[in-house]
Amino acid sequence: MEEKEQVDLNQLLNAIKSLTLQEIKIFTDKLQDELGISSDNLYSSRGILTESTSHNKEVEEIDEKTEFDIILEEVPSSSRITVIKVIRSITNSGLKEAKEFIEALPKTVKEGISKEEAESVKAQLEESGAKVTLR
């Protein structure tokens, strides 16, 4: 910044400092109108969170989740055989392990998998009749 610009800014600062609070309020309102800036934008750009912006931040954090766990909640008796087959293919386990797996529910089928894989596994289990949740 050139020396002349620095002097002009210092003069502007001194002029603003000499204003009363009421004059500063009027000045900032006019400045916001002139520049098309709202006070909401000022607060969020400074990192001051209002209730609505903090809520939006929480929603974004939830949306950013990248790893999911598949929890097998319930298997109806009429769907046991089909669910056992799906569990065997998903977990690469034997018949005995898959059968024991569905007897002690709820149980985690897969942990830390991508959203796409989680949705695929969930769809397979639900198609076979199981009740599944994603976490």
Curated annotation (Swiss-Prot):
InterPro entries from the UniProt entry: Ribosomal_bL12, Ribosomal_bL12_C, Ribosomal_bL12_C/ClpS-like, Ribosomal_bL12_oligo_N_sf
Oligomeric and partner information: Homodimer. Part of the ribosomal stalk of the 50S ribosomal subunit. Forms a multimeric L10(L12)X complex, where L10 forms an elongated spine to which 2 to 4 L12 dimers bind in a sequential fashion. Binds GTP-bound translation factors.
Location of this chain's protein in the cell: Plastid, Chloroplast
SUPFAM superfamilies (UniProt xref): ClpS-like (SSF54736), Ribosomal protein L7/12, oligomerisation (N-terminal) domain (SSF48300)
UniProt KW keywords: Chloroplast, Plastid, Ribonucleoprotein, Ribosomal protein
Function, as annotated: Forms part of the ribosomal stalk which helps the ribosome interact with GTP-bound translation factors. Is thus essential for accurate translation.
One cellular component (GO) term of this entry: chloroplast
Similarity field: Belongs to the bacterial ribosomal protein bL12 family.
Descriptive protein name: Large ribosomal subunit protein bL12c
GO molecular function annotations of the record: mRNA binding; structural constituent of ribosome
Statement: the UniProt record of this protein carries the keyword Manganese: no
